[in-house]
Amino acid sequence: MKHIVKQKYLVSPNRRGAGLDIFIDFPKHVLHMKQHEKNGQYFLMYYSDIEKTQFEKSCASKNIITMYDNSYFEYKIEGKVPSMAKYVNDIWSNHPDIVMADVDTSEYNDTWSEFTVKKLCTDDTLLMAIPHGDSLDELSEMISAMDKDPYISIIGIPYIFPNGITRMDIIAHCVATGNWCWSKAVHMLGIAESNEIQNHKDLIRICQNIISIDTSYPVLLGCDGVSLTTNDNNLFDQPKPSFNIINCPTDKTDESVISNNIKVFKDTINAVTSGFAKIALVGASGTGKTTTAVKIAKLLGDNAIYLKYPPIHDVCDYRDPEKANLATALYTGCNLMAAHIQAAMFGKTVILDRCLIDNIVYAKFNHNDMQVEIFSKAFDKFCGDISSIGWTFPLANEDIEDDGKRITDRGVQLQIHNLFAETLFLSDLDLKMLPASLDGTLSVEDRIESFLKSI
């Protein structure tokens, strides 16, 4: 197996020490292969870089127990995000060795494992428990108990419960109450999509949902004073994070709130690891970034992932400049960090529609350089491995499409364009500038063709 990689994250052995160790990592293809001590079967852990059909074929052999990392797979089924129960039923139903148990908080007690699990499992069964309940406190306590339960191998959390409680709510509550579990392969991984952000208080869900124990590097976003260490068993010790959440105040003169947000943003920069974004398109509004990025990602197919930057009008509302306060800029910057972390989990070429360069430029535009150094430091941390920057010039002789949010004023557009020039060329950024985007006389289609040739 030439794709086998060195272990980075060791999860607790299968129940009762059956000899079936689970290794979690995020390189491509095979993560770990181990022969079962009792029956000689092989256990394979696959990364999500394989398609569903390939995975089903790998399940065909009776001599191989195959487990599929769901962190990316959940985005692939019919273009939707299925529940954990659907995931297990669809993929693992042909494995009698793997059993799913839906457990309500009212059912889970000291005797649940000893009696119920024995009915579900034989000695070599891999049990996945999916908790349900109406109370965040009860769910949090049950998840913590399951983590210590020797009979439970994997804990699965659906994205959303019938009563409206989301996986992000549960994760946030587990962290807040000290019940976060670190010893098992807990499939809670998932970064909130932009349409899940209804208001600024939802940032708590973004920040605390990016705690990733499916990867080698558990990521803590927005935490203060947390250090990650490993013990002798190569398990990450459970930290005691104190989360300071970024707020977007209605009172823009609230200096204490803005000061706290600046501190949280700086702490965030120090707490998370760099992403793997490769190409970022930057530039003023209405210059063809999104159109170009989407088409390029489509042409590159499975070799690329397109990540859209959170709407820039969250940072710079041209129709009401007073809304463009620093607190909102910091909030949007954290969303971008989430995109970088998401990109890190795929290991493919990533096309970014905007990046932190845009944050720097718009912070200058709105705040006269106030706290711009925060975004500059964040850029060094998160964008240091971007290999190419495409700076989009205003399109020649074309009107800017008005979507009700972007600027259509050529004068303001050119003012921002000049700020990009100042930021890109008066800085120490060591970046490859893509000629496809540097020619304002080219149409979008011509830019795409030239862009593809340049990469």
Question: Model-derived features: where do they sit?
Answer:
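Conserved substrate/cofactor phosphate-moiety recognition/catalytic segment
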Residues: V294, K298-A338
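Alpha/beta catalytic cores of nucleotide-metabolism and tRNA/nucleoside-modifying enzymes
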Residues: M1-L31, N89, K148, V175-V186, ...
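Non-catalytic, usually N-terminal nucleic-acid engagement modules in DNA/RNA processing proteins
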Residues: M1-T122, V226, T273
